[in-house]
């Protein structure tokens, strides 16, 4: 199986705080990798280092390498915007652009990169919304404001907006934590379907969700990668006692 993202001795500092400590992971292509661990363990910090979002914070310092198809995304010659186009992000709280329609939300990324023909935009919108199983629910009101959608629909719209620009990797930071159980199920089913085309890395507090949706799991504690491996093995026969204590609820 090809490695899509290779994380090599990655460290992330915020001022004097060492948030992610010397982490190395190989993420296989077209799989789901879950990042689990207690609050404040570095999960989201780790995730956001994979598309250079920490560049936006002046006190952040990243060392080590993140290789996307063998090329270091932190190389000085690499444009961070081009990386964020290849590595999309879906946040914890649905964040559709509130002043835009459903239609305009989906094509927003394309419009940032230049003019788009109406026929091309129509195709992008339909294809993206179909891929997230939202087309049939909204096809008759594409010009309606995106804020009229339910929370679950808004999150699927955000995923549609992400995949519309054709990324290769999708990062998800607790994408279902703010949703009801039915919407959560739809997001989980969607994640499974999306791996046919994308590599997905998801942060979740919900260990049952990690077990359901992921192929591989990384357990973090206090900025350290404690254990990484196939999800089924990690949840049934973990190698480290700290991992076992966490997944059995002894701490966290």
UniProtKB/Swiss-Prot annotation:
EC number(s) reported in the record: 7.3.2.1
GO biological process assignments: phosphate ion transmembrane transport
Localization annotation: Cell inner membrane
Keyword Translocase part of the UniProt annotation: yes
Predominant location category: membrane
All residue ranges annotated as the ABC transporter domain in the record: 5-247
Top enzyme category: translocase
One Pfam short name: ABC_tran
Key words, A-Z: ATP-binding, Cell inner membrane, Cell membrane, Membrane, Nucleotide-binding, Phosphate transport, Translocase, Transport
Binding site for ATP: 37-44
Membrane topology: Peripheral membrane protein
Keyword Zinc: no
Catalytic activities: phosphate(out) + ATP + H2O = ADP + 2 phosphate(in) + H(+)
Any one GO cellular component localisation term in the record: plasma membrane
GO MF term (any one): ATP binding
Function: Part of the ABC transporter complex PstSACB involved in phosphate import. Responsible for energy coupling to the transport system.
Subunit structure: The complex is composed of two ATP-binding proteins (PstB), two transmembrane proteins (PstC and PstA) and a solute-binding protein (PstS).
Family: Belongs to the ABC transporter superfamily. Phosphate importer (TC 3.A.1.7) family.
Protein name: Phosphate import ATP-binding protein PstB
Native organism: Geobacter metallireducens (strain ATCC 53774 / DSM 7210 / GS-15)
């Amino acid at each position: 199986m090809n490695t899509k993202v290779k994380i090599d001795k990655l460290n992330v500092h915020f001022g004097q705080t060492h948030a992610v400590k010397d982490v190395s992971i190989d993420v296989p292509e077209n799989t789901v990798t879950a990042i689990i661990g207690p609050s404040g363990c570095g999960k989201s910090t780790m995730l956001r280092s994979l598309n250079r979002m920490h560049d936006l914070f002046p006190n952040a310092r990243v060392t080590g390498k993140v290789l996307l198809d063998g090329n270091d995304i932190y190389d000085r010659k690499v444009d961070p915007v081009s990386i964020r186009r290849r590595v999309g992000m879906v946040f914890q709280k649905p964040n559709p652009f509130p002043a835009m329609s459903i239609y305009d939300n989906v094509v927003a990324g394309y419009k940032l990169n230049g003019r788009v023909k109406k026929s091309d935009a129509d195709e992008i919108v339909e294809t993206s919304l179909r891929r997230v199983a939202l087309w049939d629910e909204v096809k008759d009101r594409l010009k309606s404001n995106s804020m009229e959608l339910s929370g679950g629909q808004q999150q699927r719209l955000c995923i549609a907006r992400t995949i519309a620009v054709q990324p290769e990797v999708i990062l998800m930071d607790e994408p279902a934590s703010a949703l009801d159980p039915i919407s959560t199920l739809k997001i989980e089913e969607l994640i499974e379907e999306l791996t046919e085309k994308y590599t997905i890395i998801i942060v979740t507090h919900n260990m049952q969700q990690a077990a359901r949706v992921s192929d591989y799991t990384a357990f973090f504690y206090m900025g350290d990668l404690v254990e990484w491996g196939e999800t089924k093995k990690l949840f049934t026969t973990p190698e480290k006692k700290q991992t076992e204590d966490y997944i059995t609820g002894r701490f966290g």
